[in-house]
Amino acid sequence: DYYNGPARLADVAAEARPEALVMMIGGNDAQELTDPGGNVVARPGTPGWSVEYRHRVDQVFDGLRADNRRLFWVLQPNVASAKHQASVVAMNTQVRESAADRPWVTLIDGPALTAGPDGGYADFVTLPDGKQISCRHGDGVHLTVGCTQLVSDATVDEIAKTWAIGETAAPAGTPLDPTDGKDASGPQGAAAPPTDPAASTDG
């Protein structure tokens, strides 16, 4: 079906003007893609679908770009169904490739955060303290509260790495500063203390 999501999201962001924007959407995107007239332009599983989906992801990311803003995008977690998993991989691939060219986008690795020991889908996950928690509801898709918290905590950690309270964020697209490890649109590194002329000598 057709819905101009990129335009709507851009409008909402322009009105709300968030500095940190967290999104986890797209779980139902593996369907026919249509134009405004309802005409099918791409079907799932075809090369054309990947091209069109990438174009729409690009539109979303570009529409949400703004100075002093970072977009934290959660990749779709793996699912139990092999058929649907292929769609998840296809969607995440296009998102990863788009984000690689857009330094104002930080990806949260939903598949890795909810994976089992083999790195794939898991009904249960083991926490660092050894405690095992249920990760999925019976449909093999939706996350439980416990697993949602894992993803949320990881997202908050990424936000904390990007911003320090009270600091001003750099403009979107600012190159990585190797002196402080901050990425684009994150806070600038602390300025070096001014030099005291009285402390200098002529030898």
How should these model regions be labeled?
Residues 24-30, 34, 58-92:
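Active-site segments of SGNH/GDSL-like serine hydrolases
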